[in-house]
């Protein structure tokens, strides 16, 4: 966990807001309200000045005194929260090597830093060689490959044949890594952090159906989260929204029956909330099953109504 102290750079007299990172789902709207009171926290703009950042990631101190976007900062914190000890070194060393400072670059680095090799202990070359072999093979290797691998020789060849970069986090070899461009600076890539019932992508229905300009919403979500996702996609009217289903953890009986051509993100969110709050998780009791199926029928009827009206450009899921 991290903790960021954010302020309005234009009006420091407004005070500060302390935001936990990653933001717990049930605190998201409250955190947004704290920032709105300072006249910051825009859904798309980087308008939050970082006064301080308390985290286990020293390299992130470069964000202090810069302006960031709340959702980008939250997304980065979620990505880093899942990192292993090895990735901890890889990310920080590559940030320093590449002199990265923008949130876009930092987020993109989380998707590719695993390709780099960082040596923090030169006394165990066997382990260094083994780690390097895994890094350049996408983190995958069979037991037979690893048993036959000469870790010491692999490490020596790496050190002798390549120029490493000395950082505060170890000597890093990029192994030809190219900075990922998965994040375009507006549409955060789909990433499961918490257990969710379903993930829905939204885009303007004026976008091509195969458009990659998709903003992801993890249901159930608060009304504020849905509205901010719409703002990030430039959608002012829910009627102009196209929905895409990424995956689902709905109970099988609902997942199979549900017509995902629903055009109402709020009703789909209600369905996810009913399923998520069932006493036995995905094992729905009879009372809640009736509520789920009632929701399903309501959503399905609305989708059928659109078809009868000859609606051609509606949501596809």
Task: Annotate the PLM regions.
Residues 122-199, 206-214:
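Extended, well-ordered protein cores
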Residues 11-16, 56-59, 179-181, 207-213, ...:
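Short, surface-exposed beta-strand/loop "edge" segments at domain boundaries and coil↔beta transitions
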Residues 1-44, 196-235:
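N-terminal ordered "arm"
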Residues 28-102, 224-289:
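Structured domain cores in non-transmembrane regions
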Residues 39, 80, 87, 98, ...:
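Short, flexible helical or helix-coil boundary motifs
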Residues 94-128:
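Phosphate/anion-contacting hairpin/loop surfaces
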Residues 150, 290-301, 306-317:
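Non-Sec secretion/translocation targeting segments of pathogen effectors
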Residues 68, 162-166, 303:
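Mixed-charge, low-complexity intrinsically disordered regions
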């Amino acid at each position: 966990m991290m903790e960021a102290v954010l302020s309005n750079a234009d009006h420091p007299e407004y005070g500060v807001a302390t935001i936990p990172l990653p933001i717990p789902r049930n605190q998201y709207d409250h955190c947004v309200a704290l920032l709105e009171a300072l006249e910051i926290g825009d859904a798309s703009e980087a308008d939050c000045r970082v006064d301080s950042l308390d985290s286990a990631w020293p390299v992130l101190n470069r964000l202090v005194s810069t302006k960031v976007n709340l959702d980008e900062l939250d997304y980065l914190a979620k990505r880093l929260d899942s990192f292993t000890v090895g990735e901890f070194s890889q990310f920080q060393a590559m940030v320093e090597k590449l002199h990265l400072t923008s949130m876009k670059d930092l987020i993109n680095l989380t998707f590719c830093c695993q390709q780099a090799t960082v040596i923090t202990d030169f006394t165990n070359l066997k382990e260094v060689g083994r780690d390097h072999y895994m890094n350049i093979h996408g983190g995958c290797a069979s037991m037979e490959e690893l048993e036959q691998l000469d870790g010491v020789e692999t490490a020596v060849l790496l050190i002798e044949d390549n120029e490493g970069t000395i950082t505060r986090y170890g000597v890093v070899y990029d192994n030809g890594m190219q900075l990922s461009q998965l994040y375009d600076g507006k549409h955060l890539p789909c990433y499961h952090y918490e257990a969710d019932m379903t993930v829905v992508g939204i885009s303007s229905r004026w976008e091509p159906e195969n458009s990659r300009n998709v903003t992801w919403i993890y249901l159930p979500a608060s009304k504020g989260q849905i509205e901010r996702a719409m703002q990030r996609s430039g959608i002012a009217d829910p009627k102009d929204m196209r929905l895409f289903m990424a995956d689902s953890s709905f109970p099988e009986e609902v997942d199979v029956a549900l017509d995902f051509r629903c055009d109402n993100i709020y009703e789909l969110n209600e369905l996810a909330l009913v399923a998520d709050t069932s006493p036995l998780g995905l094992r729905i009791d009879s009372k809640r099953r009736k509520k789920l199926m009632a929701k399903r029928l309501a959503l399905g009827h609305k989708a059928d109504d659109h078809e009868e009206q000859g609606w051609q450009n509606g949501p596809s899921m």
